[in-house]
Amino acid sequence: MHYSRKWPTNNVRCPGTPYTAKLRVIKNQRQTTEQRKDMVNWDVIVIGSGIGGLTAAVGLSNLGKRVLVLEQHYLPGGWTHSFSLEGHKFSPGVHYVGQLNEGGRTREIFEGLGVGGDLEFLELHPDGYDHIVFKDETFDIPAGLEKYIARLIERFPDERSGIVGYFKLMKQVDRGLTMAADIKGIFDKLKLLLTCPAIVFNGLKPASQIIDRFITDAKLKTILEVRAGDHGMSPARVPFALHVAIEAHYWNGGWYPKGGASAMPKALIGRLKCNDGEIRMRTTVDHILVDGNGADRRAVGVQLADGKQIRAETVLSNADAWITYDKLIDRRHLSDAITSRISKLEPSISALSLFLATDLDIDALGLDSGNYWIMNEADVDATYRLAEDGQLAAEGAFPGGFLTVTTRKDESKMHDGLHTMEAFVFVSYTAFERWKESATGDRSEDYEAFKEQLTQRMLKMISRVVPNIENHLKLCELGTPLTNVFYCNGHRGNIYGTAKSKSQIGAGVLPIKTEITGLYHCGQSTAAHGVLGAMATGVMAAQQIANCRHDEVLAFAEEGKITLS
């Protein structure tokens, strides 16, 4: 099947009429934006423009559904948004993306949605896309699993057998995760048990327990545990299966979207608009409209903060679990079971985010496009003990943190010849809760003083990698968990949705299809987090809403391939 193409003036590729045998062809007569805004009914309303919601929106619009996305922020993308400060561009939620190699899952989704040709990704330093910075040395993690294993053995020769055994188990569990994704019944579960017992018997055990089984060297344990920051749970708590999923995601290296994280929602929104879909910014949903009672409950649309009602056959919430169930749905429409479940739900970790612009000579410092995991002590769990401390001290060294030189990843982001950096430290929302009722930009002097003290602590940590940074700053701005609440509407400033603990993954995840007919849920509070995880939940939501197969949602790869540079 060949599609005619219309090329819009904004250089976003606009394919012609999408097709599927299961659903109707979109009308040839395109409606104007003004007419679309006057429509009484949509097929699907998506609440929130995070990457999961946009994935579902594009998938459904490709299949002929009329989709409206409503976003409370003035920037689309949720944690994949980018913003500017004094002309410098920052992307707080995306620092690298994996599985963009041929056959990679992330690539499959972007290309399958028909937006591959609109995206270019830049490879992080292949000989060290992640740098683990100790006080006395730096260990570089290279792209390619076998290269990584060989480098570990070279650095820790006495741990050779443990390293080999550990990665053998990781490969087995990774294979089991692939199989587990296709489980549909008891026979599939039995097949998984028989063919991949490694995941059955190890998947829910704490990652640190598995690592301790194979490894004795404290520094090596740190290297194997430190990227827990990519899922935000202590190695002592995170299920090994999730730890493997995150590690395996980057076995072939990492990439960064050219133009910043916002390039991804931009491509998806361009496709959505070409399919007669629409996104409305600064549009806050007050609540979801539900008709009927008991088993007859059905979502029929939304009511906005200004009182306007918009009707739709289906509503998909891309908001987090607490916003969705505690704020958008009237309690009388929820069962006691789901109400109790939400009340016990644990949010993921929060963080401080430091955004910098500097006139330092980055070349002279030898900094590259890789990420820097800075460890002041070898105990990775100390990072998470700090994050659980509601009495966050204003002074002292952070046990660990994360730094990225974003203009090294994408030189097109340079402004006025300055380099930009982003740094992050996990902290507790509780330490900032006393200021939660104050307005952003109008908070008290003690809040601003606390921020300044924390900024200095972070700069001291960063100076291990970037000496004299504090004397070469042209821009320095700190975001707190309250910033996360304001811009991303995340419960208690969480950055990964629900905590992916033993009780909240696998069978414990919140469902895509809710107990209310016509109401669905996707994003980081459901099955998975991160760019790929959230997109995967969007694909699952589109499948269930359209009642179609996975390959039908991702049937548009011929529209173009991702460029890797």
Predicted regions and their residues:
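C-terminal segments that line or cap access tunnels to active or ligand-binding sites in enzymes
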Residues: 360-479
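A conserved FAD-binding loop/helix module that cradles the flavin
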Residues: 526-545
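N-terminal glycine-rich phosphate/pyrophosphate-binding loop and immediately adjacent elements
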Residues: 38-172, 498-499
